[in-house]
């Protein structure tokens, strides 16, 4: 996959609106998608899917990128670069990606992947409640099930 700067900038705008300005993700995405009418369905899908995925895995990605809220502009780029590296996407030679430590990101991901609250990207309080009420073994299964993407189901009424 090749990254295009205008699409990455759109994702960064969505992340800024959602993380820093506390706006709803769907409203922010809707607003950003109106910026450029030339974007096709694939471009729009990339912006929406990437934004939602980064928002979903915020805790893991911010821990790997060592970013703290409120996020500065360069920290949002770091979070995006963590997403791209973990997806196996080669980062372009843009100034925003010059200091990206690929190996350290992958190493930190491997380390954090062993800790449930980071692996599943959930808050500490939720992890504590789930583990105490369901037990560690059942909570692990429940969390992994919750993080699987739902299959598409279509119903046809005749």
Question: For each of these PLM feature ranges, what is it?
Answer:
Residues 1-156:
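Class I Rossmann-like S-adenosyl-L-methionine
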